[in-house]
UniProtKB/Swiss-Prot annotation:
Molecular function GO terms recorded: zinc ion binding
Keywords for the protein's UniProt record, in alphabetical order: Metal-binding, Phosphoprotein, Zinc, Zinc-finger
Organism listed in the record: Drosophila persimilis (Fruit fly)
Compositional bias of kind Low complexity: 327-348, 364-398, 406-427, 562-575, 780-798, 822-878
FYVE-type zinc finger segments: 917-977
Region entry Disordered, spans: 313-460, 497-629, 777-905
Protein name: Lateral signaling target protein 2 homolog
Higher taxonomy: Eukaryota, Metazoa, Ecdysozoa, Arthropoda, Hexapoda
Keyword Phosphoprotein: yes
Biased composition (Basic residues): 576-601, 609-627
Bias kind Basic and acidic residues: ranges: 544-558
GO CC annotation, single: early endosome membrane
Task of the protein: Negative regulator of epidermal growth factor receptor (EGFR) signaling.
Compositionally biased intervals (Acidic residues): 430-458
Family statement drawn from the similarity comment of this UniProt entry: Belongs to the lst-2 family.
């Protein structure tokens, strides 16, 4: 009992104080605070007072984190290398590794041990519950042992632990810490793995391969000139976007067997690109159709966002037109180039004049729209085929892309692809569905004519449709301007004219222009979606009613299929020569003008009806325009076979149609290429930019490694400052402190660093000699020796001018001109001063004795005049100016200090050498390191660097020409005070002698008067 009381008293005696900074004391107070918060939480019902409970829980977690951090420091010191490894933290995301991670883990362990479960992680919580209970139990044991050590072996304010290694409790603490460290590390891995997604070994390796892909992509871009090495060395932020985009292209095309191999199973693909696997497959299929020039153009666009500038001649593009309506155009043109020389020449002629024709068509289109807007009351204009195709593709279930194919958004001439994309149209789009079915039949007819080419084009079309639809959920980079806004392409006159090039002739158009009256009004109307789109489609179906009134009826689907078969047979058997001109003529009329008020309109429609077997003008327009270029190319071969029976007008119109078809082919290839590159850019940029958001941490690590690997291998040159053999070479200037003070209006504020002292010109330094004064030199040694005064004055001026020089060469001259070092000069000057003082005292005594004799033994005027004459001869004013000798003695007495100030300039020394700031990281007196707030101060007497506390004294330094108080260190201040006191004593004695001399002079003057 007595032993327990003694032990308790000893524990109270060894209780750590609140201001104790040792580890054990800090743990003791943190643990007490945590215990108090936990006890308060247990003292009331948290559901009754939720606000108080939430505040206490927040304090509890803070205290838990504090206790664990101190415990971690104790384990670092006691366990050292015996601690459990935590290499698994490399798998954690960066946002998980926070300072309060330990507190979160402890709080989670207590919750799991109490029976709680992680939301949506019930299975993992059940598995971790035994481990959490073991962690909390082990931590409680460690806390008890550490509190006991705080009372036993705490050393106040000790930086290390002082435990008794022979004590049983110390050994028990050591083993408990090892167990807790192992359990806590295991729980950390389990808990974090359950809360966030931790990379597996395979995923870690895949991300390393992605880093290799990024590095190879960057090296390839540097090699072909897409990027510059300076951008890599400067860590250009633009590369953060360019490298992932280029890596997608390179991984799909250049390094096809790398980490972006789309042929591997989806579960083996990296998690970064796994969500984009479908769109990446479509992008890969489209990239394989690009030639080298177009691939380079796409990569340049991904790097610089410049405009696409592709020059695609006829037959030179490796990308076939992906639209079904032109499936046979590239093949036909190539066949014509190989088998028919006349077609080749026609193609060249047409392509040469294509630009001018497009401009004329745009102007004519604008004129027609302005002239005939008043005719809309006659009949309601139906929507254009391109608008219908856009509407068909913009179903409520489809993506907001303007069209499923690149050509639809720029030069669309049919809605067959749109009908294939819109698999679930609304029920009230009846007329639109009939038109879509008609165009599907036209597409089947084209497949019968050219099966292989059309099959390839349909496959490419599906790829583009998939890529376009997939780009709907991708968020493009909003910083890339209009290039990333393909969802709303305005149907301007340029776009409309480009799609109507194949429906205008060069000669017939001028003749038929006066007859065209029924123009459409809304050629430039924007496409819309959802309910507005349904109303537009319904309005389009209603606009076709006037055409039904002219004797044309819409046939059923079965009748249309029969007519299509009859049309196919008749097309293969009949002669194209007989109706080629009227066919193209009809297309022009039906596309631009759906009906005519002229009296010949009905005759033209009756003339076309036997050839096409299609009474509906809308279907006639789409199907005719769809096969226009193909028919024109076929007509070339048949025209050569029937030239003998053909007339001149038919031959000329056929030539126009051939040139127009070839010119249209060139334009379509160009627009298709640009639009395909544009869509590829949107898809690739969308995938790469989403990596910046969804996988920001992983992408940062990869890009950091890529930059470090590809930086310029320039060896870092270590700049070594050569040793200065001469003290004067350490400084760039020799500014006098007195000059600086005079320039700053006499301010005695301290200058914080040597760099703040501004050197002036040499003439300023030489002019500043008038401010110099020597405190240790006596000022009245020129009373009886004016010649020595002049000599010393000239030498002082010369020395003062030399010491004010700020160039290094002048300093070397000073060093060579001085016969001895500075301290030797000071000793010699001190000896000279002592000698002059003794000589001056002797002269004062002699003169006093002489004055005493004169006042007693001689009162004659001659003696008085001689005395006055002698006094005037000794005056430096009379010596310099050469004025008359009829001056009063008071004038001589007044001008004596001027000679004294000139003589004292000889004692001015060179200012001390300042130690550079970079050479003094600590105060030279108290050794306190300098910081951003503890600034450096130079002593003006010794040149050392001190802190503000050690250099808070001020004193004048006349020996350096500093007559006003400047900053000095404490040691120099003590020395200067001693020197000043000694010099003051000497000057007092000299002043007494001067006063006695002046009194004697006044007595002599009075006697003479």
């Amino acid at each position: 009992m007595i032993c327990c009381e003694i032990q308790q008293k000893s524990h109270k005696k060894n209780k750590p104080q609140p201001d104790d900074k040792s580890l054990l004391a800090r743990f003791f107070h943190a643990d007490r605070s945590l215990t108090a918060v936990a006890s308060e939480l247990d003292s009331f019902d948290g559901r009754a007072e939720p606000d108080r409970c939430s505040r206490l829980v927040s304090r509890l977690r803070q205290n838990q984190d504090k206790v664990l951090s101190i415990t971690n420091l104790i384990m670092e010191e006691l366990l050292g290398e015996d601690r459990d490894p935590r290499a698994f933290r490399a798998k954690f995301p960066e946002e998980v590794l926070q300072e309060n991670l330990a507190g979160q883990l402890w709080f989670g362990a207590e919750c799991l041990a109490a029976g709680s479960s992680i939301m949506n992680r019930e299975v993992e919580s059940k598995e971790m519950r035994p481990l959490a209970q073991a962690v909390t139990k082990s931590l409680g044991n460690v806390r008890v042992l550490l509190r006991d050590q705080c009372l036993r072996n705490n050393v106040p304010n000790s930086k290390t632990l002082h435990l008794d290694l022979n004590d049983y409790t110390t050994e028990q603490l050591y083993e408990s810490l090892k167990i807790f460290d192992r359990l806590f590390a295991e729980f950390e891995l389990s808990y974090v793995s359950a809360m966030v997604q931790v990379k597996s070994r395979h995923e870690y390796e895949m991300q390393q391969w992605i880093g290799v892909l990024f590095s190879e992509t960057l090296q390839r871009a540097l090699k072909i000139g897409l990027l510059d090495q300076d951008m890599v060395d400067a860590f250009d932020p633009g590369l953060m976007f360019s490298i992932p985009r280029l890596a997608i292209v390179a991984g799909l095309v250049v390094y096809a067997k790398g980490p972006l191999d789309m042929d591997m199973p989806g579960d083996q693909l990296s998690e970064m690109f796994r969500p984009f696997r479908t769109i990446l497959i479509k992008i890969r299929d489209l990239l394989r159709n690009l030639n080298n020039q177009e691939l380079y153009q796409l990569e340049k666009l991904l790097c610089t966002n410049e405009d696409i500038n592709t020059k695609v001649p006829v037959g030179s593009s490796s990308i076939e037109a992906p639209t079904p309506e032109h499936s046979s155009t590239p093949t036909t043109s190539s066949n014509n180039n190989n088998n028919n020389k006349s077609s080749s020449s026609s193609s060249g002629t047409g392509s040469g004049s294509g630009a001018g024709t497009v401009e004329r068509l745009v102007d004519q289109r604008n004129n027609n729209n302005n002239q005939q807007n008043s005719n809309e009351s006659t009949t309601l204009p139906p929507r254009s085929p391109s608008m219908l195709s856009l509407s068909a593709s913009s179903t409520p279930t489809a993506s907001p892309a303007p069209s499923p194919t690149p050509s639809h958004s720029i030069a669309s001439t049919t809605s067959s692809a749109a009908s294939s994309n819109s698999t679930h149209p609304p029920a009230d789009w009846s007329d639109g569905d009939d038109e879509d079915e008609d165009e599907e039949e036209d597409e089947e007819e084209d497949e019968l004519e050219d099966t292989e080419d059309d099959t390839d084009e349909e496959q490419l079309l599906k790829d583009i449709v998939a890529a376009d639809c997939a780009s709907g959920y991708l968020i493009p980079n909003t910083n890339l301007g209009n290039l990333l806004q393909p969802q709303q392409v305005p149907l301007t006159d340029n776009f409309v004219a480009s799609e109507d090039d194949d429906e205008y002739g060069t000669g017939d158009q001028q003749q038929e222009q006066p007859q065209q009256q029924g123009h459409r009004k809304e050629d430039e109307e924007e496409p819309s979606t959802s309910a507005a789109l349904q109303r537009l489609r319904l309005a389009s179906s209603d606009d076709s009613e006037p055409h039904r009134d002219q004797g044309e009826t819409i046939k059923s689907t079965e009748e249309q299929e029969q007519q299509q078969q009859q049309q196919e047979q008749q097309t293969l058997q009949s002669s194209r020569q007989r109706h080629s001109h009227s066919h193209s003529h009809s297309h022009r009329h039906h596309h631009r003008h759906h009906h005519h008020h002229h009296h010949s309109t009905h005759q033209q429609q009756l003339q076309h009806q036997p050839h096409h077997h299609q009474p509906h003008p809308h279907r006639l327009t789409r199907s005719g325009r769809k096969r226009c270029s193909m028919e024109a190319a076929v007509e070339v071969e048949q025209q050569e076979q029937g030239l003998a029976s053909g007339d001149t007008s038919a031959a000329s119109s056929l030539s126009d149609d051939v040139s127009l078809a070839m010119r249209n082919t060139t334009a379509r290839l160009k627009f298709n290429t640009e639009n395909l590159l544009h869509r590829l850019f949107v898809c690739i940029a969308g995938v790469a930019d989403q990596l910046q958001t969804n996988f920001a941490s992983d992408l940062r690590q990869i890009l950091r490694s890529v930059f470090l690997m590809n930086m310029s291998s320039v060896e870092e040159e270590q700049i070594e400052i050569p040793e200065k053999t001469k003290e004067s070479e350490l400084f760039e200037f020799r500014a006098s402190e007195n000059d600086v003070i005079q320039e700053s209006a006499g301010s005695n504020q301290s200058i914080y660093s040597a760099e703040e002292v501004n050197p002036e010109l040499d003439n300023v330094f030489s002019a500043g000699s008038r401010h110099s004064a020597g405190a240790t030199m006596q000022r009245n040694n020129t009373i009886d020796n004016p010649s020595s005064s002049n000599t010393s004055s000239s030498s002082a001026t010369t020395r003062n001018h030399v010491t004010r020089s700020r160039s290094l060469g002048d300093q070397e001259t000073i060093a060579r001109s001085m016969p001895a070092p500075v301290h030797q000069q000071e000793q010699e000057m001190q000896q000279q001063q002592d000698h002059q003082q003794q000589q001056h005292q002797h002269q004062v005594q002699v003169q006093l004795q002489r004055q005493r004799n004169n006042s007693v033994g001689s009162n004659t005027p001659s003696s008085a005049s001689s005395t006055s004459s002698s006094s005037e001869q000794n005056s430096p004013v009379s010596t310099r100016s050469g004025s008359s000798r009829r001056r009063l003695q008071s004038n001589n007495e007044t001008q004596m200090p001027s000679s004294t100030s000139t003589a004292t300039a000889a004692a001015t020394l060179a200012p001390p050498a300042w130690i550079p700031d970079g050479k003094a990281p600590r105060c030279m007196s108290c050794q306190t390191p300098f910081t951003a707030f503890r600034r450096r101060h130079h002593c003006r007497n010794c040149g050392g660097v001190f802190c503000g506390v050690c250099s808070n004294a001020t004193a004048p330094l006349p020996k350096y020409g500093l007559t006003k108080a400047v900053r000095v260190c404490r040691d120099c201040y003590v020395r200067e005070v001693q020197v000043r006191s000694s010099s003051t004593t000497t000057s007092v004695s000299v002043n007494v002698g001067v006063q006695m001399q002046s009194q004697a002079g006044r007595v002599q003057t009075a006697t003479a008067s």
